[in-house]
Amino acid sequence: MFLMRGAAASGLLTGAPYLSANPLGLPIGCQTYPVRKSISTDFAGTMKGLRAAGFTQIELCSPYGYDDFSSLQKYKPQELRRILNDWGLGCISAHWGSNELFQKADESIAYAREFGMTQMAIAALGPFNPKTSQTVDDVKRYVEPFNAFAEKAHAAGIVALLHNEGFVSAYIDGKPVYDMMIAELNPATTKLQFQVSTLQQGYDPVTYFQKYSGRYLSMHCQDWVKDSSTKSGFRQVPLGKGVVDWKAVFLAAKSAGVKNYFVELEEDPALMPLSVPYLKSLKV
């Protein structure tokens, strides 16, 4: 099980977990990618720990598209759902690999439907480490297969989500690729999931929630402080302990139509449970 510290660890050990709390009228969610190593060895135990820490909803990564989640292939989708239900965790969303969505769309959609998911997300379109030679034509080329997948997903009652990492958060000739991609997406079949840490690249969540109100459904939440000793110049901290104005973010998110959010602190998974008390106390 992943390490928990402080109040979150105390709650688990004493049998007094943070119970259901929806400070924004939304479940407190957790992206499971930061705890992927723990999931690979003890899925049920990791889910127990997340629930004890106060999370009531998770977002998975596909067992067939993410190597660190491949141990979950031994479960049928309904079995995974049953384990989550046993621990009182909801799961309506997962991240998928591009090959799963573009080359194996029918199989992936069938898996999601059997699981009971209503959202299928992709972390990025195009390269995760984009080159300066990328062009506007590349943007259109990357969006085209996602629109095709989204049409199939929509017909099956599932929403296709575009997350903004990698090339999606890059710039071409000083212009944001993200806006170019949004312009190419079919708004009838796609929604957006905002990565709050892209504020570090100049993508302000409040600005985007206001600019594209109605297009967003979800977001990943990170907080950080400046730290010159790190390669990025930033260091992640629990939500509410860093530079992000969460009240402003959640107010804008609520107005934009965001229906779920997931804490995702990959640098140190132990920071995620420490974010729960702040989220429980936050009022917007």
Where are these regions (language model features)?
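Conserved, mostly hydrophobic/aromatic
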Residues: 30, 50, 58, 84, ...
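Glycine-rich, proline-tolerant flexible connector loops at the mouths of alpha/beta enzymes
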Residues: 59-79
